[in-house]
Every structure is written in structure tokens, then in C-alpha cells.
Amino acid sequence: NPRTSSRPLPSGRASKNFVLLLLFFSISIYLLSCWLICDFVFILSPIPLLLFIVYPYTKRFTAFCHFFLGLALSIGPIAGGVAATCDLTGLYLTLPIGIFTFFWISGFDILYALQDYQHDIRNGIFSVPSIYGINNAIKISSVCFIISLIAICYYSFIYTFNFLSILIILIILMNYIFQIIHSLRNNYSFFKYNSYIGILILILVISDILFI
């Protein structure tokens, strides 16, 4: 892919051996950290690893590969809750954020794949844009954004309803609208702005603690 050819591994700036060594140490530290937290967390620790290993290969057989990425990242807030309690008692708090993350990342990744539309078609790579077309991809992404917004509104109104939470939701909504409107242009700008959403969600969760 010409778009990703300058990245460290494709460009040769990072050797395969170095990347494999880095991967080995990263996984080792991750598993050790899970083991130190508690047995329950350690037992569940292979699940995120499996999802991140499988995700890149999903582009070879399903257009819904974006949702595998969304699933892999949506485990983050849920796993954080499990790590904090070593059980599933906090699931009612973390599940709405997990659902938000799933649809937010899936919707964004669909729009992000628009820039590889021609390349994916030529090389037989599966994605929502390459299989269902650009217009349908934007529609599916919009539905994902709407569902994610409903999920975070639910979390906000139930647990953190205050002026700050309303402001954050409005900013996220405007960000979504911006992404959809500019989805056929340079993806870098809304990739940058999209990265700020995670920070906004962190502020939203912190406000839950401050305003209780």
C-alpha cells in the first residue's frame, strides 16, 4: 500500500527481527502485569491478544474487518474495570463506554478506509468501502456514530449528568459531523481530531468522580 509504505516496517527502517523482539517483550510485560493483578485477569488476558492478532487477517475475508478493530479496542475500558475489581461487578459502568468505543472506532475506521478504496479494490482487500461502495460506507459509518453517541449519552445521563458532560457530548457530536462531511478529503486532519475523543471520554469519566 503506497500510503503505508513509509512506515518503519515496510520501509525497512525497522527490521523484522527487531519488531519480533519488541513484540515478544511487549507481550511478556503485558502477561506479567495481568498475572500480578490477579488470577482472574490473567485467565482473561489472552482474549485481547487474540483479537489483535486476528484483526489484520480479517481484511482478507470480510468487509466487516473494521468491527474486529472496534471490538479489540472496546475491550480496553471493560478490561480496565475488571482489572480494578478482579471481577465483573463493575460491568454496568464500563459496558456503555465499551459499546461507545466499539461503534466509535468501527465507524471511524470505515471512513479511514476510504483513502484506500482504489488500492483495496485492485488488490482484493476487503473493507466496507471496497465491497459496498463509498456512499454506503459513509451511511454505515454514520449509523455507527449515532449508536456510539446514544451509548455515551446513556452513560453520561445515568452517571455523570452535568454541564461538563453535556459540553463533551456536543463536542463529540460536532467531531462526528466534521468527519462525515470531510470523509472524502484528506483523512489526516480528522484522524488527528478523532484522537482527542479518547481524552474527552477520560475527562467525562473523571467528572463522574468529581461531581458525585
Regions found by a protein language model. Give the residues of each.
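Extended hydrophobic alpha-helices typical of membrane-associated regions
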Residues: 147-212
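Residues within membrane-spanning alpha-helices of integral membrane proteins
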Residues: 20, 24-27, 45, 49, ...
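Intramembrane alpha-helical segments
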Residues: 7-92, 96, 175-189, 196
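Functional transmembrane core segments of multi-pass inner-membrane proteins
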Residues: 40-52, 66-121, 134-147, 153, ...
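Multi-pass membrane catalytic core of lipid/isoprenoid biosynthesis enzymes
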Residues: 1-45, 122-163
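Alpha-helical transmembrane segments and their lipid-water interface positions
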Residues: 2, 108, 112-113, 201-202
